[in-house]
Amino acid sequence: QVRPATLRDAKAIAQIHTIAAQAVYKGLVPDDQLKTLSVEKRQAYWREAIEYCEPQVQVAVEDEKIVGFVGFDRSRDEKSRPTTGEIWAIYAAPTHWSKGVGLALWDAARDGLQEEGCTNVTAWVPLRNERALRFHEMAGFKREMSTAKTAVVGGVKIEEVRLKRPIN
């Protein structure tokens, strides 16, 4: 089941975000940097995001426990059209990887973006994050290699690429 996030969900979202990021970025980011990821800082971020709907946040729930989340809204890219949405973040608890949670969250985000009038959607993914690249490609996204850029994550430079697909 996927539903809109409430303020009470911020801590669980932050925990999943932190644990999943530590698992995903292991080997891409130095371990000492990964240890500095803070549930408290992420909780404050997601609490504010939920309160102000920027981005919109949905959670996947199994047996009354949050097992994943997605944040989505209009694209933050400067030159994007107003009809382009963006997946800002999509994470499942590592215990729920490859169990359909991500696809359920993607479906909810797609529906939400479609309701907002979006016709395309993008996502920025680290080039070395094979799991995320496979997931997005399985969901119909295509890499736009000309968009590759360097982002700083926890003080470490990471190469990212934008992926894009039509909403329908």
Predicted segments with their positions:
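Conserved catalytic-core motifs of GNAT/GCN5-like acyltransferases
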Residues: 74, 122-126, 137, 142-159
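Glycine-rich phosphate-binding loop
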Residues: 100
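Conserved active-site tyrosine of GNAT-family acetyltransferases
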Residues: 17, 64, 136, 141
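Hydrophobic pocket/interface hotspot
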Residues: 13
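Acetyl-CoA-dependent GNAT
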Residues: 4-7, 18-28, 32-95, 103-108, ...
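Terminal substrate-recognition subdomain of acyl/acetyltransferases
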Residues: 157-168
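Conserved GNAT acetyl-CoA-binding A-motif
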Residues: 113-124
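Hydrophobic residues on conserved beta-strands that form the core of alpha/beta folds
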Residues: 2, 87, 158-160
